[in-house]
């Protein structure tokens, strides 16, 4: 699913012309293309990066192992998950020749929303507190 979503994003940029963002594509922020030139050559051969991001490492570890990711057991589990994601990115890069990157991101703007959705789906996870103000 992640691969399909990332490739959908990548493929949606194919055929886009530099006019879509002159600052980026014509005036040098990314490239100096002619007006109306397609950006495709900057989507291939490692010039661009397709980013897979993850958030909620603590919450995932707490839900799956009932320990923090800072404990030896939790750290081992969290590292296995991250290595799995990294291996997937490496596999996709090898298969496509495109640059894939893995990012762990603090996502404060999503925390409340995702925590609410997780609580609705999985119930209360011990040691993870969510105060809903509705």
In which residue ranges do the predicted regions lie?
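Short, charged/polar micro-motifs that form catalytic or ligand-binding hotspots
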Residues: 43, 47, 68-75
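A structural motif corresponding to the C-terminal end of an alpha-helix
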Residues: 8, 84-99
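Flexible loop/turn segments at secondary-structure boundaries
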Residues: 58, 66-68, 108-113
